[in-house]
Amino acid sequence: MAVWQAASGKVYLPPSTPVARVQSTDEYVQRTNIYYHAYSDRLLTVGHPYFNIYDIQGTKIKVPKVSGNQHRVFRLKLPDPNRFALADMSVYNPDKERLVWGCRGIEIGRGQPLGVGSVGHPLFNKLGDTENPNSYKGNSTDDRQNVSFDPKQLQMFIIGCAPCLGEHWDRALPCADDVPNPGSCPPIELKNTAIQDGDMADIGYGNLNFKALQENRADVSLDIVNETCKYPDFLKMQNDVYGDSCFFYARREQCYARHFFVRGGKTGDDIPAGQIDEGSMKNAFYIPPVNNQAQNNLGNSMYFPTVSGSLVSSDAQLFNRPFWLQRAQGHNNGICWFNQLFVTVVDNTRNTNFSISVHSENTDVSKIQNYDSQKFQEYLRHVEEYEISLILQLCKVPLTAEVLAQINAMNSNILEEWQLGFVPAPDNPIHDTYRYINSAATRCPDKNPPKEREDPYKDLNFWNVDLSERLSLELDQYSLGRKFLFQAGLQQATVNGTKTVSSKLSTRGVKRKRKQ
């Protein structure tokens, strides 16, 4: 960025050398009047709401973890528009242009009824209630209780052509000359990582690596006690120079403190009031009680609330409604580079957990004589239901020197995917072909086959949704397509066999003046 800096502390001077300016995609991408509708199947997933269930060996997952407090990250794979056999070949010149997709609208459909979920821990670190205490309670060896609560209410989705960037606090390495004492609090740092499918969202206890920073395994609920809660780094994505991770987003969060508790255990940071003799902090925070009082055994000061998401209502839903993209927050105005789109979703307003009970002896219900709770196996399951619809606009990128330089500086892999300047070598008229190439009598096959371009996100976990054969030009045949045509005042027409969209023009006549 070109910024002015103070030379001697008094005068601000302009940048000494010109700095390359990042262009918006609107400056070099040409949009056509051809629109496609893309839609997914009904996307379903079922699992346990708190943890993975493994087999006896503990190596294979029998039932995956599926929680309403997880991020769902859909990686939508779109077809390559440059391979489309367009009926109207005047749309673009393949020798001078390349086709890309532009996202103009999206609707994230959610099934299942609204419901409030409950999370908790059978051994939760809760010493006592500090909102309305009736006696002074001190610490013991184990004060854990069976506590449950409803999480913070969260609805959010983020649209981009790159994975959403998340942030969380994690354990940091201490300085080399600073040897920490046993039991001392470790330093922490803010880390940025991509949000993957299945990563836990913040449910009211912050974006923290609980697995590394809460060794008692009792300070939070079961669904996050061994996890890392992430939160989208909106500040960093909004200031991204290209804006690929977040075209736009919608967010709705709400919570309130329902109960106020205090932690059990030994306080690591003592209240500064215990100096010997007449220290500078003596009686600064509290005055010591007499020896025969229960208050003489000072209680903990590790206070915390249990949050609640409160009312769940259909009046404040972000889903099952269309969103239109006119202007993105960054320089990328909805262009889907590499023919893919990332949709990051969190919605815990449909957070009902199913309780399933099975008789341990598989006895018919009509033959059970007396109720015995120990003869029933109780199970928990959570289900998620999604459906995604898109409005895609066909766009052209001119292959000029200025545009190619801009794209190469942004991501050179885009040009490699377009195969610019690729001229195949002349074919040798005679090749050697072995019949039994894998036998011991012939030479080994080629050990260095041509490498395909590696997926930069191969190590990340996403819900892959293939839309390569789910596109249609018949916008008026789909719900989102009809909404798009109506809200924009457009109508469809067929030009040279290709469906195009044009504006509706008013043909209202001019009112004649009345003769005097």
Swiss-Prot record:
The reply to whether Disulfide bond figures as a keyword in the UniProt entry is yes
Molecular-function annotations in GO: structural molecule activity
Q: Where in the cell is it found?
A: Virion; Host nucleus
Q: What GO CC annotations are associated with the protein?
A: host cell nucleus; T=7 icosahedral viral capsid
Keywords in alphabetical order = Capsid protein, Disulfide bond, Host nucleus, Host-virus interaction, Late protein, T=7 icosahedral capsid protein, Viral attachment to host cell, Viral penetration into host cytoplasm, Virion, Virus endocytosis by host, Virus entry into host cell
Its primary localisation, in coarse terms, equals: virion
Q: Could you provide one GO biological process annotation from this protein's UniProt record?
A: virion attachment to host cell
Q: How does it assemble?
A: Self-assembles into homopentamers. The capsid has an icosahedral symmetry and consists of 72 capsomers, with each capsomer being a pentamer of L1. Interacts with the minor capsid protein L2; this interaction is necessary for viral genome encapsidation. Interacts with protein E2; this interaction enhances E2-dependent replication and transcription activation.
What the record says about family reads: Belongs to the papillomaviridae L1 protein family.
Q: Give the protein's function.
A: Forms an icosahedral capsid with a T=7 symmetry and a 50 nm diameter. The capsid is composed of 72 pentamers linked to each other by disulfide bonds and associated with L2 proteins. Binds to heparan sulfate proteoglycans on cell surface of basal layer keratinocytes to provide initial virion attachment. This binding mediates a conformational change in the virus capsid that facilitates efficient infection. The virion enters the host cell via endocytosis. During virus trafficking, L1 protein dissociates from the viral DNA and the genomic DNA is released to the host nucleus.
Protein name (Swiss-Prot/TrEMBL)? Major capsid protein L1
The organism named in the record is Human papillomavirus 20
Name the gene that codes for it.
L1
